[in-house]
A protein has these predicted regions:
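Anionic-ligand binding patches
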Residues: 25-180
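N-terminal G-site helix/loop of the GST-like fold
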Residues: 1-11, 179
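Short beta->alpha connector loops at strand-helix junctions that form conserved
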Residues: 11-17
Length: 180
């Protein structure tokens, strides 16, 4: 966002991110983005200030692939994604604080951006080398497209690259312009 010309503060939101029973992945990411934005705006927003919150998940065959708990789970996720297409979904919520700094938003806007990502067919050796690098261990779906090793996994992408990184910047900037 700084590269887009915005002065930002990063403030983590302390919310419960547990999915509801039978909650669809896209519904989940939008709900979490809204909850994060509301929590941060209520606590920290100044008059007319914007709060941008996001949550990103990786989904495959309708199930959410979170961060791997250990190397075995990372290997299993990478094998599952090997040669296949999965989705990266980011829910975004932008809240414009009221001009009197009331905790309630004067306006808000939210959306979900989805990008299809297709992996190359991965050999066991490639998976082992990538897992051994440690790179997949703190990433949803056990990979980071922006990482050194992660770049080597992706065969094709349909949608916004920056959505896969974690924030669809161009769409966020356009949404901000609507609120200003």
């Amino acid at each position: 966002m700084r590269e887009a010309g915005y002065d930002i503060r990063v403030i983590p939101a302390d919310i419960d991110e547990t999915p509801f029973d039978d909650e669809a992945p896209l519904t989940l990411v939008e709900r979490l983005a809204r909850a994060k934005a509301a929590a941060v705006a209520a606590e920290h927003a100044e008059p007319n200030e914007l709060t941008v919150a996001a949550d990103t998940i990786v989904t495959f065959d309708g199930k959410i692939l979170g961060k791997p708990a250990d190397e075995d789970e990372a290997r299993a996720m990478l094998r599952e994604l090997s040669g296949r297409t999965h989705q990266v979904a980011t829910g975004v919520c932008i809240v414009k604080a009221a001009d009197n700094a009331a905790p309630h938003a004067a306006e808000s806007l939210s959306f979900v951006d989805v990008t299809d990502v297709t992996f190359y067919e991965l050999s066991d050796e490639e998976i082992e080398r990538y897992v051994a690098s440690g790179e997949p261990m703190d990433k949803a779906g056990a990979y980071g497209i922006q990482g050194t090793g992660g770049r080597m996994l992706v065969h094709d992408i349909s949608g916004d690259f920056y959505n896969v990184v974690g924030l669809p910047i161009a769409r966020v900037v356009r949404a901000i312009q609507k609120l200003l």
